[in-house]
Design a protein with these regions (language model features):
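Structured catalytic-domain cores with a bias toward divalent-metal coordination
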Residues: 1-189
Length: 189
């Protein structure tokens, strides 16, 4: 996913984006765990995506320092998008988990509509993205995830988790078949 994102951002298609935005990409935050087969947990057995609300400098250093990067960037200019990239083990396609404002008065409804613009644009531009898989909530038990902690602490409205299925997109007869040996082949296109 990150390779595809970087390739796109460096392509002529993203020239206009590069003119208006500065992109900061923090690579994999759990390399030690992944090397030993843990895609969620560090070598200490900590699910690092559940430590974003109060990361410990010594127990969760990748999260602690990633938040420091965001804090530093916020001092320089407004951060308009935070996106945590994940692989999903059950659902197919690509989809976003986002946040929402609890104020359902007029202003809250407008802000909540704005939160859906980036996912909607992705769905319109790429058949791998499915709006029906997207969720925009502040659920119990998710307060310590990256998207929720960043949304609340830094007031970054566009704070998302982008999930891409380990199994590719839904197998639809009208669409290309999924390469079962490389489920991310379609994402690289």
């Amino acid at each position: 996913m990150v390779n595809g994102l970087i390739a796109y951002l460096l392509s002529p298609k993203a020239e206009e984006l590069r003119r208006h935005f500065i992109f900061r990409i923090v690579p994999m935050l759990n390399p030690d765990g992944v090397i030993y087969g843990n895609y969620r947990c560090s070598l200490l057995g900590c699910d690092l995506n559940r430590k974003w609300d109060k990361p410990n400098k010594y127990l969760h250093p990748p999260i602690y320092y990633a938040k420091n990067i965001i804090r530093h960037l916020q001092q320089e200019r407004k951060v308009v998008l935070f996106c945590d990239l994940h692989g999903h083990s059950r659902k197919q396609n690509a989809f976003f988990y986002g946040c929402c404002y609890k104020n359902y008065e007029h202003e809250g409804r407008i802000k909540n509509a704005h939160l859906r613009i980036i996912p909607l644009m992705c769905c319109q531009k790429n058949e791998l993205f499915k709006l029906k898989g997207c969720r925009f909530r502040l659920e119990r038990g998710r307060e310590s995830t990256a998207r929720v902690a960043i949304f609340k602490e830094f007031n970054i409205m566009n704070s998302f988790t982008l999930e891409c299925s380990f199994f590719g997109k839904e197998n639809n007869v009208k669409k290309k078949a999924i390469d079962k040996h490389d489920p991310f082949a379609a994402l690289k296109q």
